């Protein structure tokens, strides 16, 4: 009776998924030990390393230079007064102040005068005439208002300014004469402008007051003679022949009251020697209808129409 009620035994295959048998565990361990190892088993993090590494064929980036640190001036612990640097001091000086400084330095140290002369740029005709024009403007503004502008009273008011202008004229004129000035055209242009300024000096009722202007005319006439003779030696005097200087000098002589007649005579003799002076228009090329004049002026053939023959 008990044998009939006893529970039948459970087959062994029902326990395969519940508990491993010792024989299966040992065989499983042995099979895993005999299995060939792969590279992934030795270095499990190699996959992460390869993923984080950059491709071998990617372009190499140039290293960026590190920005240089700016040199920041540290504030002085103790601030005190000090003189300006020379560069800042010169920036505050105007033309008159700078000229005064240079003049005083050259007076105290004469050896600096030569250095300043060689260092300063050579004055041009326009700059020299501008200086003379400034003296003339100062002279004109010094005349008394109203009254006779040629009286002795007016002369005494502007006498010093006349002296300053004539002194500057006497200093600039030799600078533009040969051999110091190698370009004849530059010398002629200066004399033309300087003579115009000299014409504008006033004439006074007292003849004695006009002596300074008359002496200045004599000096400027000598300067014209020097330049005219030098121009005749260069290029066959082409500048005198076709520059119109005979007409300009004749006009200056007429304005000066004949005080430049000596320069006119030298110019006439130079043009006659060169065979180019016929009348007052010789420097312009002679007869406007001549072929020579048309060739020099570039008008040859412009007055005559082009004739076309019939076919």
From Swiss-Prot:
GO terms for molecular function: proteasome binding. InterPro entries: Cut8/Sts1_fam, Cut8/Sts1_sf. Pfam families: Cut8. Residues 38-50 have a biased composition (Basic and acidic residues). Residues 52-70 have a biased composition (Low complexity). Keywords: Cytoplasm, Nucleus, Protein transport, Transport. One of its GO terms (biological process) is proteasome localization. The keyword Nucleus applies. It comes from the Eukaryota. Residues 24-84 are annotated as: Disordered. The keyword Cytoplasm applies. GO terms for cellular component: cytoplasm; nuclear membrane. Involved in ubiquitin-mediated protein degradation. Regulatory factor in the ubiquitin/proteasome pathway that controls the turnover of proteasome substrates. Targets proteasomes to the nucleus and facilitates the degradation of nuclear proteins. Belongs to the cut8/STS1 family. Binds the proteasome. This is Tethering factor for nuclear proteasome STS1. The gene is STS1.
